[in-house]
UniProtKB/Swiss-Prot annotation:
InterPro entries: Homeodomain-like_sf, SANT/Myb, SANT_dom, SWIRM, WH-like_DNA-bd_sf. Residues 28-57, 570-598, 629-645, 1303-1325, 1358-1382, 1390-1416 have a biased composition (Low complexity). This is Myb-like protein X. Residues 1-57, 176-204, 294-318, 450-849, 1049-1506 are annotated as: Disordered. It comes from Dictyostelium discoideum (Social amoeba). Residues 925-977 form the SANT domain. Transmembrane segments: none annotated. It holds the Pfam family SWIRM.
Amino acid sequence: MSTIGNNASSIGNTPILGSVPSNIAAAPPTTTTTTTTTTTTTTTTPTTTTPTTTTTTTNTLNTMIASTTPLSTTPTNVPIKPPLLINQFGKPLPNLSSTASSPRTPIKPFIGTPNNPSTPSSLIALSSPIGGGGVGSTPFSNQFIGYSGGGGGSSSSSNNSTIAYNGSTPYKPVLTGSGGIGGGGSGSSTPNRGRFSGKTSNIGGGGGLNNLNVGGGVGVIVGGIGNGSSNSGVGGTTTYQASQLVVTNISKGTTTKRSFPIPTNITPPKCPLPNWFTSLDNIHQVEINNLPEFFQDDNENGNGNGNGSGSGSNNMTEIDYDEIDEDEYSYVDSVEYKYIKKKQKLQLSNKELYKIYRDYMITSYQKNPYQYLSVTDVKNHFINQNKKTFKVNIRSIIKIFDFLEYWDLINCFVNSGDYMNIISPGVFNYCNEFYQSFYRKKFKHEEREKEEKERLEREEKERLEREEKQEKEEKERLEKEEKERLEREEKQEKEEKEEKEEKEENEEKEEKEEKEKEEKEEKEKQEKEDDKEKQENENEQEKIEKKENKNDSQNKEIKENHDKKDETTDSNNTTTTTTTTTTTSTNTLVAESSSSSSTETDDNDKEMKEQPVQENKDKEMMETDTTKENNGVETTETTNQTTDSIETDKEMKDQPIINLEKEKSSEDKEINDDHNENEKQDKDKENEKEKEDKTENGNEKENEKENEKENEKENEKENENEKENENEKENENKKEKEKENKKENENENEKVDEKIEIDKEGINEDEKMDEEKEEKINNKKEDEEVESEIKKDKLKENEEVEGEIEGENDEGEVVEEDEDEEMEIEEDEEDEEDEKSKEPKKLTTTKSANDQLIKKKKPLFECKKCKADCSNVRYQLVNNSTALDGNILPEYFYPMIICVNCFSSGNYENFIQSSSFQRIEQHQPEEFGWTDIETLLLLEGIEIFRDNWQEISDYIGGSKTPEQCLTHFIRLPIEDEFLERKISSFPVGSLSKKEIDSNNPFSITYGVNNPIMSLVAFFSSYSQPPLGLLASKAAKVILEILNDPKYQQPSKEELERIQKEKDDKEKEDKEKELKEKESKEKELKEKDDKEKEKEKELKEREDKEKEEDKEAKDKVDKEKEEDKQKQDKEKEEDKEKQEKDKEEDKDKEKEENKEDKEKEGTDKEGKDKEDKEIKEDKEKEEKDKEAIGDHDKSDSTNTTTTKEMEIEKQDSSTSTNKETVEMNQDDHVKIDEKETKENDKKSITEEENQQKDDNDNNNNSHNHNKEIEKDDNKENENEKEKENENKNEKQIENENEKEKDLNNLSESQSSNDQSKSNEQMSSDNQESKENSESNSNTQITSKEQNITTDQSEKPKETPTTTTPATLPATPISESNTTTTNTIVDKENNNETNKTNENNSNNNNTNEENKTAESNNMETVVENNEKKPVDNDDNNNNNNNSNDKMDVDNKNNNNNNNVDKNEKDKDEENEMEEVEEEENDLNDEKKENGVDGVGEEDDDEDVEMETASVDIRKSTTTTTKTSLLMMSPPPPKKSRIPEPNPEYFSEAAIQAATAAAFETIQNESKKYYELEEQEIRDLIRSIVICQIRKLELLWKFYVTYEQSLEKEKDYYEKITKSHLQ
């Protein structure tokens, strides 16, 4: 097998794992030597030969254990490899699906010359001669043009054996002979039947290879013999009928020197990405899906039929496989064709064979994952093992072989994160390009088809659901509209009724007011008329007096001027004119005065009545009155003038001027007559108009009343019709509701299934809800507009009606009506504005950049607990799931959706099982589009939030996921110009020559094609940061953004709105904090209340217990009384029996007295003896009673034993008395009557006294036992609590001190002297235990004694110091060794036991106990004098030990041997543990004393003392300490050069921003809305992001290098373990 691998790597096929091309500097490999024979390989030129060494280079990173392969069902425990970070797609990478075979890489065409194979343009230089190569078939490729004979086989020339090797596969090397005649090539046949390999003289096509110079022909099923013996072979032609490709005229035996790439496999149709192969059945299912040809037994056809021509003859005919019966025949595919007829054995199916081959391949790969397995090896394996009847189908083996390798390729390069562990970085650059295109081209189309199908299905479902929802919504909307319409109509009706009622009330009020006004006006008119008459009379008298005075003056003047007649005539003519003017002027003045007085009265009326309409009417009426009055005054004046003129005429009859006066009077009359006629005409006209107005107003009022009546009738009819319609609609609604209820009952079972679909359509529902809201808002607006129009129409109608009523001439009223209309319209507008303000306002201001350009997507699914987005992966509660109790969960828990974090942390109800949740993965398609503003926001978010990608995605607007943000940030270009340059042109800096010349993959000269490494090397070697580069890059980005007219700065209104939102959030946060504080305070109060309630409950329990104790005592007393009563009854019965017996005895005695008198002498002696015995018994009983009383006072612990003894003695005494009576009866002693009576009385009194004493003793003992039991229970509870507290404290201290103790124990060595002294101490303790057992029955009042130890009995070398765990520790003395308090306690016990021995020997007298107490007190004084430290502690410990001794003595008095044995065992185990721990502590303290005790601080001493107590319970071994003491190796420094810290300084960033700002100012002379500081901030963010990117790359490679080093260490350990 080793020769095959070496030849394969040199022939020019794809490289095996571990082999690296010559033009790539691989990582320093570790070599493993194998002893094999040397072979020679030929290159392009046949003359040159290079001998290959036996050492094969393999990469240690690729060595794997067989159990780590994922194909193994039960892998063993192997250390976990450190994973890598991310792949080129930006997602976390899974592990390899299969490492069973080595990955193969595609090879690019050869570009250089064949003689120069080390050119860097290609991985492998292929210069092998290619002749007439055979054409083979593989499961995934229609043809395969092999190198150096490809599909053709070969045979060995030395032995002329019949073994023929099949052709190569796409990923396995070609097998060729070393010389001689080549075997026949393999053709293709049906997949159900085996292939046939040719022989040199039998079947086959052209010959094989001979020394790699000449190619062979194409093999067929029935072909000629190939001429392979010479240096030229004859090739045949093939035609593929079944396949798509047609290959003809394969090149014949001429040699050609050219290179040809290995073609890649064609992917199978609908090939999904592979998953982890958990089991063989899982693999088999994937194989069935991806190998349909192999598992179709009926309709399978071969890839093609070849016809080869050769110079040989045909010795074999073609066989029809369909004619062979599977029941009769089974065959073995070997070199020679042998058909064996066996009827009993059946032929296996293809699937079974495939499983067998597959299992064999997998097991072989598990044993050695990187071994080379050829098809012939598998075939021969089955032939050798199953020689009887087995079908070896070579085609199936090839399918398995290629199938496994195909999936390994995809897993390694598309779905894997460990590709760098398998392939070197140079190879990966080529493979990455190929497999990216491979993945995108081959699987994108199929994925799109699937997505389109799924999309169409979803759209159909969504469409159907939408239609259903729309129908439902329309029904609901119609119902709502009808309801709203009915409500509106009802409201309108109510409003109309209210308006009508108000109008009627107003009209009634107006009529009443008008009547009152008219009455008032009539009264006022009468008063005015009376006043006017008085004034007129007074005026007339004044006028008469004036006229008389005038006439006198006129007469005088006439007399004086009688001579001047002519002049007087002229003067009289002028005076007449003046008088007329004066009269008119006086009339006007009177009218004005009257009008002014009337206006004043009218103003007073206005103030009283407060109605503008009536005031105007009053004004008009008063004006008409004033005009009439003025006319009346004028008429009176004219009449007075006429009377005056008549009187003057009478007086002037005798005078000569009479004629002149007549003429004047005539003229005046004419003038007055004309004036009066005009006034009369005006009055007539005014009266006519008033009459017309009154008639019109009356008619209008009548018409209005008629119209109102008609309207009321119409409204009543309409209301009746509406009520009928409403009743009909209600009936219809009831029917519809009944139908809906039925439907709802039917759909209740379907709701659970619909909920899941509704969750998937969350986005559509949200959009629909938004649309519905908008529609509702629009509908409301339309309704409001309609209502406003209706109101306006009504107002107009009302205005017209009021105008007709009030009249057109009333100008003041018309003005006020217009004002009322305007007020009503304004009120309606205000109501509309209020309703609009209640609705959600639509912002008219310009939105910010985030709001305008980015719409935040609502999540499809939200976590029910933490409200996080769980649309990609979520856990949903399954329907009809059960709780922990077994009960089904109620319906209100569904649907419960939880995110991954809540599920893993258990953030859900405690009674719900985790198995009742179902994991649902719904990965959304990645959105590749990124706008410029989204990138800018991403950069700003990185500057603000740094590594928190969730907040960065929220800052962008939620349109991108955190994973998409990270991938886009990594894909952003840093600076492409500098990658085009050569790295050699840059200064190297601080790097040494060794790093440059070495093969280190992380050096500058290594991996030129890796852009990331070149960038890291470039920036690390720079002495100063490249500020110009960063500035120019930032300037370009910002100019592109600023010059785009789309992007504008947000307005001030939006900024104010944002600030308001922030303020609101702050207020909300404060409110939340206050609420939280209040809730906490409430919780504290509740806790306090609960504690108080608990205390009350405890008190109640205690009271109940006391009451129960009292009841128990009462019961005991009752029982005692009952016992006494029973005893009394028994005594009475006994007395009666005795009396009867006595009477009988008396009768017998009388009869026998005669006989007994003779024997009296002999019986008197017997009587005397019996009397003496009775007296002795009584004396003993009295002594016993006295002893019992003393015993009860001395020791309470032995009450139980004394009771038993007393009861036995009492029983014995009673029995003796009874026996004596019986003996007397049996012996028939003759006693006198007096003596018998006396004896009977004595016996009765004695029995009564004894029973009383027994009852008293029993009661005392019973009460005493109860008290003892209570004390014991209390002591046990206290001891348990103390032990639990000590255990908890010791566990905490042990954890902290184990490390120190273990380190000290590993360095310490135990001393022989101390071990001997400890052994002596342990032996003394054991002796003391034995002594304590012997003295278990002794009675000691240990509660009153304080037992201590004499220092003289202790060893001199070991002074004692006590450090109990519960008390504070004391510093260590200068002595080398210490002992613990437990030993002191046990030595005290030993001394107590010795004193007990002495007391037992002296019959337990009280005097000896007192002496023991005095001796013990002396020992306490001595110890206290010699122990100045911790006296209180010792006393406490002694008291505790004495309490324990009391319990031991009580248990020992009960003589329980079983408890003794158990205690002995426990004590022995404890002593052994203590001895071991003391030895360790002594060793530690010796070392501390030698190294320097004085240098340690007090804190360290305290820690050592606490450790000495806690280590007693921990049993450690030296093996554990040896492992823990192994110190880890020091961390290695990274080989990557660290970046220059000046590059990350603040000065560098500021310089870069200033340079970029200058370039922007120079290049663009426009005016931007942004300010200078804002532009500088943008530049700064871009520069920092670029720096941040480099920093992340450096960290990535540092972690990557550390992972490689860890893997190297890991594999070195594995190799060492295998070698060992």
